[in-house]
Regions:
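Nucleotide-sugar donor-binding/catalytic module of glycosyltransferases
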Residues: 1-124
């Protein structure tokens, strides 16, 4: 993973997870396919009883940017707090585990379009 001058990724992407094995691969594939590569992906497993933790471990073996917090079920807010504690990025984003992103989504968000339009006024 490339990092900025401080040694931290530009963006920490938090993914709260609870029993979403059906959607998780598509979600993680979209996170890893981002054109903005300077990210860390923090999966917060909130006590899933399905195959979600095994899927996360599989992705962790494939890509060092994927990390997991594995904790007892305590709800969404607690999951986000754990993720924020671990996040090292300058910015933090959230991707829900049953969603996916276009491959350029984070890059587009990191470089918002700026338009400058000069105004000329003629004095009479």
């Amino acid at each position: 993973m490339s990092t900025n001058a401080s040694g931290s990724p530009v963006l920490s992407l938090l993914i709260p997870i609870y029993n979403v094995q059906r959607y998780l691969r598509e979600c993680l594939d979209s996170a890893l396919a981002q054109t903005l590569k300077d990210i860390e992906i923090i999966c917060i497993n909130d006590g899933s009883t399905d195959n979600s933790p095994a899927i996360i471990r599989e992705y962790m073996e494939r890509d060092g940017r994927v990390k997991m917090i594995d904790k007892a079920n305590s709800g969404y807010g607690d999951s986000m707090n754990h993720g924020l504690e671990m996040a090292r990025g300058k910015y933090v984003g959230i991707l829900e585990s049953d969603d996916f992103m276009a491959s350029d989504a984070l890059e587009n968000l990191s470089r918002p379009p700026i338009a400058i339009m000069p105004t000329l006024r003629r004095r009479t």
